[in-house]
Amino acid sequence: MAKLTAAEIADLMPQVPGWSEISEDGMSRLNREFQFDDFKTALSFTNRIGDLAEEADHHPRLVTEWGRVTVTWWSHHEGGMVVADIEMATKGDAL
């Protein structure tokens, strides 16, 4: 997995509508907030994302709140976004 360049990120972002590129600690990250009707549904979604992450051995930051889950993907090892982040975002969107 190689860290994506700014040009590669710009080319790939249309594949993940609803997601945003953010920068934290000098690293590009893929971020999206999902809305739900209640905490139980948000928690269930968090667990399903966790299952996907375990299967792929690629783990996001997950913030679960009442009616909302924020998912942030990036590679700790590469220090920014990688193609796997786009792939995982797409899989998460399909849940």
Predicted regions mapped to residue ranges:
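C-terminal structural segments of small proteins and small subunits
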Residues: 70-95
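Short amphipathic alpha-helices within nucleic acid-binding modules
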Residues: 40-47
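Short Gly/Ser/Thr- and Asp/Glu-enriched loop/turn motifs at secondary-structure junctions
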Residues: 64-68
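Short arginine-rich
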Residues: 21-22, 48-60
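Solvent-exposed alpha-helix faces
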Residues: 47-48, 90
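Alpha-helical scaffold segments that form or flank carboxylate-/histidine-based iron centers
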Residues: 31-40, 69-77
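N-terminal first-folded block
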Residues: 1-37
